[in-house]
Structure formats: C-alpha cells, structure tokens
Amino acid sequence: MDPVACEDVAVNFTQEEWALLDISQRKLYREVMLETFRNLTSIGKKWKDQNIEYEYQNPRRNFRSLIEGNVNEIKEDSHCGETFTQVPDDRLNFQEKKASPEAKSCDNFVCGEVGIGNSSFNMNIRGDIGHKAYEYQDYAPKPYKCQQPKKAFRYHPSFRTQERNHTGEKPYACKECGKTFISHSGIRRRMVMHSGDGPYKCKFCGKAVHCLRLYLIHERTHTGEKPYECKQCVKSFSYSATHRIHERTHTGEKPYECQQCGKAFHSSSSFQAHKRTHTGGKPYECKQCGKSFSWCHSFQIHERTHTGEKPCECSKCNKAFRSYRSYLRHKRSHTGEKPYQCKECRKAFTYPSSLRRHERTHSAKKPYECKQCGKALSYKFSNTPKNALWRKTL
C-alpha cells in the first residue's frame, strides 16, 4: 500500500466548523488528536500538562515550541532511515499572523513527516538528509497561475490538479470499479472504501472512511444535518462545497467554461456532465445487467436494485429507500414542505417536476402530442391507459 500523505488524513477544522461539532464528535476528535500528539512526542515534542482540546485550540504556541524544541537527529523506525536535524532559530523566517492557523497532522507518519498549519501558514518537518528540517512557507511566492478561476499555487502538482478540474482530465483510475480521479490521493481514498479498512466506520451503514473529516461529512447524509446556511436566501446545506456553489447562483459567477461551445457553469460537476453531452461518455457499467451510467453516484444507486440495499430509512414510517434523494422526497409527504415556488404566481410545489409542469401553464408550452388526434398538452397523463398514445414532440 502506498504511504499515506499528510494531506490525505489531515484533521483540519475552522473555528466555525468546530462550533458545529456535538459532544460525541468532539470526543472522537480528541481521541484522534491524542494519537497524533503521541506521534509528535515520539519525535521529540514535549507537552505540558494540558488537555488535548486546549493544545489544538492554541496551535501558535505549539507551533513556536515545536521550533524551539530539541529535535536533534531524530531517526524514525521508518522506510528510508533519513536523519532529521534541528535548524537554528536565525534560519527561520517566522512571523506570527493575527488569524489563528488550523492544524494538520498525519495519523501514519512516513519518515516522521508532520504538517501544522493551513495553506497560508504552513511549516513542514522534513528529512532533508542533514539539511533543513523546518521549512516555513508563509510568504513563499505562488508562481503557478490558473486563469479559470483566477487562483495561484505554490507548487506545480497543485496547479496541475486545479487544471484538471477545468479540462476534465482524470488520469488515475480505480482498478476495482473503474472510477477515475484527478489526483492520486483520490485513488487512495477509493481503495480504503473498497477494502473496508478505514479507521472510521459509519454507525448507520458501516461505510469505512480514512479520516475524521470525511466521516463527519458522511454522517450528515444519514442525520440530515445542514450547518451551512446561505445569508441571502436562508437555504441550508450539508456541505461547505455545496454551499459555495449555491452562493454562485446569487453572484452569477460561473468559473467553469466549456471550450467547445463556450457555455459556462457554476460547478465542476455540472461542467463535467455537460462535457459528456459532447462526448456521449458513460464510463460506469453495471456488471450484472450491462447498463451504463455517466455518473458514479447514479451507478451506485442502480447497483442497489440488484443487491436490494436500501440504506435511507424514514424515522416516522420506517419506509426505506435506495437513494437519499428519494428519501427526501418521501419526507415531504410527512412535513408538507413545498420548497419549489413558481416565480410568476408564487404557487409552491413539493417536487421540481411538478413546478416545471406548472410553469408550462404560463408559457403555453405544450411538448406532448396525441398520435391519434394531434391534440397538444403541456404534460402527459402518466396514470391513464391513453398514456401510450402520447409522444413528446420537443
């Protein structure tokens, strides 16, 4: 198995995210960080008699003490036997910033590599064979510029990964299921999922993931928790990435542009879906029935029709569903929620399909035509024997 890099297992919370964790999640977090601090101790780090949560909430002090500690020729019981040496303070360009950095640490140390900080506040303890053990990167230049959207990167691999978001290139393929990824770390995470060896197992469905952050995110698919709220329309989201994409619907930002037709999109996933309208690609094929799918998620839900798995269960009536989307649709039958509203008459609907059908009454659009009499309607009668006589004309 490939060595685990720090960025693949980093536990990294912002203050806002930390405030959203409940007691059980913080307890799990402390257990993970305890193991991390033990690893730090094994390479010479000294801790005062303070609790773990306090240590993590004060990373700047730990950051400084780590620099000033005696880390002389640390040799890990590792794969390469590299020697780590301490750098004098005068060789460190250390400047404190006002904003507290976040901490990143590695569960599985490979030659003792440890990272503390975020992208703008990052120090690595590296074995450079007798040279720099600490490399401070706060004010390092970012020579790699991405124009779509405008972002700068310090390292070329990060820049290449960002480029693949726009080009759709996914050079790393999983041998188990064929799913492709833009980075090698994606493959490692996928292999953990297939092997079931991840240290964090979901108590609802048994799915294993390799790091705490992904575990907490996955848990929300079962609990329905939505901690990210849009300030403009008060809509809530389970994931920060979904929240950011939604915000672009208000700002009008569309950073992903198709090079073939010039159409732009709010999200990378929408852009990738659009690209397949040009290529016709359906890379996910069911081994049991041969049906192909454009999306891995659709493929996984389809597989459940063969296995009979229904992981999403309604707490009110115990009815189970194959997909979370179907579960949400069913949930509205209990709550009476109607989130889809017509912009013209303000009438609300439970499902988006009902809204689209209603909107045709305003536009006079009638895409269905009777084969026998030629009469046009805005929608077909799906529950009548006459359904077979209607065909879609648009």
Curated annotation (Swiss-Prot):
Can you list the GO cellular component terms from the UniProt entry? nucleus
Entries under PROSITE patterns matching the protein: KRAB, ZINC_FINGER_C2H2_1, ZINC_FINGER_C2H2_2
Q: List the cysteine pairs that form cystine.
A: none
Fetch the InterPro entries from UniProt: KRAB (IPR001909), KRAB_dom_sf (IPR036051), Znf_C2H2_sf (IPR036236), Znf_C2H2_type (IPR013087)
Give an example GO molecular function: zinc ion binding
GO BP terms: namely:
regulation of transcription by RNA polymerase II
Where are zinc fingers of the kind C2H2-type found along the chain?
144-166, 172-194, 200-222, 228-250, 256-278, 284-306, 312-334, 340-362
Where does the KRAB domain lie?
Answer: 4-86
Task: Give the main localization category.
Answer: nucleus
| Gene3D superfamilies the record matches | 6.10.140.140, Classic Zinc Finger
Pfam families named among the record's database cross-references: KRAB, zf-C2H2, zf-C2H2_6
Q: SUPFAM superfamilies, alphabetically?
A: beta-beta-alpha zinc fingers, KRAB domain (Kruppel-associated box)
Localization annotation: Nucleus
Keywords of this entry: DNA-binding, Metal-binding, Nucleus, Repeat, Transcription, Transcription regulation, Zinc, Zinc-finger
| Family indicated by similarity | Belongs to the krueppel C2H2-type zinc-finger protein family.
Q: What function does this protein fulfil?
A: May be involved in transcriptional regulation.
Identification of the protein by name: Zinc finger protein 763
- State the organism named in the record: Homo sapiens
Tell me the name of the encoding gene: ZNF763
